[in-house]
Amino acid sequence: MAACFCFFLLAAMLAGCDVERRKSDAELGLNAQQAAGRRIYDDACDRCHEPYSSRDKKGPSMKGVFKHPYLAGSGLPANDARVGEIILYGRAKMPGFGQTLSQQQVNDLLAYMHTL
């Protein structure tokens, strides 16, 4: 009887919890290039740069990286050429990915980053 009560109590508590679910590419309205970039971001960037916060991450959040004329912290232009260069060659504590990502993958990644 006590086990039944505990089960129902736990079920009732969990029913009230909102579990954050990752949205699909379609729900985010991503095109094929942006979706490919999202997969690259998940594999190569997310360990240091969470899209929406930098909590417990080494690098800054990438949310809105292209919504401002200059990159936060460095004052460098926030454009595809400059951000692509940082992705390829790195900066300060960030390693470059020029040996692991093709130019097409960098372009896909930039397309996704524009959606953040």
Positions of the model-derived regions?
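Gly/Gly-Pro-rich "capping" loops immediately C-terminal to redox-active cysteine motifs
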Residues: 34-38, 50-85
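Inter-heme linker and motif-flanking segments adjacent to c-type heme-binding CXXCH motifs
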Residues: 20-23, 54-55, 115-116
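C-terminal motif of bacterial Sec signal peptides marking the signal peptidase cleavage site
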Residues: 13-16
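The canonical Cys-X-X-Cys-His
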Residues: 37-51, 109-113
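C-terminal capping alpha-helices of c-type cytochrome domains
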Residues: 33, 85-87, 92-93, 97-116
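Bacterial N-terminal signal peptides that target proteins for export
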Residues: 1-5
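Cys/His/Pro-rich metal-binding microdomains
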Residues: 46, 63, 95
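Electrostatic cytochrome c docking/interface patches
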Residues: 18-40
